[in-house]
Amino acid sequence: MQTWPQEPKSVVDYYQQVGRAGRGVDFAYGILLNGDEDDEIAEYFIKSAFPKERDVSEILAAIGASDAGLSIPELMSRMNVRRGKIEQALKFVMSEVPSPVVKVKSKFVATPLLSQYRLPRENIQRLTDIRHEEMARMDEYVRSRDCLMNFLCRELDSPAEEPLCKRCCNCCPDGALPTACDPDLAQKAAEFLNKSDLPITPKKQWADVATAAAAFGIEPKKNIPTELLMSEGRALSVYGAGGLGRLVPEGKYRASPPHFSEQLVDASVELLGRWLPDQRLEWVTCIPSRRTPTLVPDFARRLADRLSLPFVEVLRKTKDTPPQKEMENSAFQQNNLIGAFEIVGEVPSGTCLLVDDMVDSKWTFTIAAAILLRAGASAVVPFALANSSGGGD
């Protein structure tokens, strides 16, 4: 049996995979799963296949303004562009002949052709259109009620010898696989979805050493001092994923007023008891927000009550900052939060559970934990309802 958890990118790819799956056996099932998210995934990869013209222009302008050239970390400190996107843009322009940029050791240096370089828009658009057409044909295959093998053959300009294959689910609907399942297995699957917690590992290094050193009054060294490091934490779920992950956006964006359900409190208590059976948490606080000032504190207070711990609001947001999800690389993510929090009141000693709704880059937890540790907390354990990370920095 061969199973595709999502649609292949094209009919040709799918046909080749079907051929490999059935090779050397007399009989095999091929099951293609599809859902609404398939088009979203395909669209994401199509859109991210080439660098954005805006990013390329900004990168080349920065390199052109530097006689000695710039390294990737230096580029990251100058522009709000993800490291992976900077690397993608540089790889793309350096593949051009002639190239507007060359690499000299760790730095990227402009060539005399830099001022004349233009992104090949027509070629990029042509390839993008081809990929959209491939995606549309794959969608049509999934929706088709005709013989599926004949559909594939027509797409490959190789008409089938017989009008019907007499094997696919459209030709033989009575031979389709059963849709009923063992209730015990369904229950186990539901339990698995509700136990999709992920570790929150502490960041060990600053992204912008000079800015962090000035803010915390410490030596300008790359490594974050041990006394300012948060402990390892946990994210309860994967944002938007089945089970608990869907309850987080429901509570934050669709509930009126925004409110996280008691089911999330129950699951958090269960996770903390399972993950930290021997570690004693001594108090609870949360990351403050000026956009939704009561959402996370309300949840953290209910969680603290269930854990029989005091809830102490000791962090205050001092200014409005752009959402962290708009910060594309580590330097901008770190510096967006420098000076954004302050301590109000007295910070209890002992191990603190620091609660937030979502975690992505981990810089919010990193900066807030450093502030709490410097103010007297003995340890800070971060806890988020969902991991919303999409990768990158």
Per-region residue spans from a language model:
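Residue-level signal for inorganic ion chemistry
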Residues: 282-285, 380
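Active-site-facing substrate-recognition patch
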Residues: 189-283, 293, 297, 301, ...
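Residues at the starts of beta-strands that form the adenosine-phosphate
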Residues: 29, 310-311, 351, 378-381
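Cofactor-binding loop segments of dinucleotide-utilizing enzymes, especially the Rossmann-like FAD-
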Residues: 33-36, 357, 385-387
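A phosphate-binding catalytic loop at a beta-strand-loop-alpha-helix junction
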Residues: 354-368
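C-terminal helicase lobe
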Residues: 1-196
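Structural motif
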Residues: 1, 29, 283, 351-353
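PRPP-dependent phosphoribosyltransferase catalytic core
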Residues: 191-192, 366-393
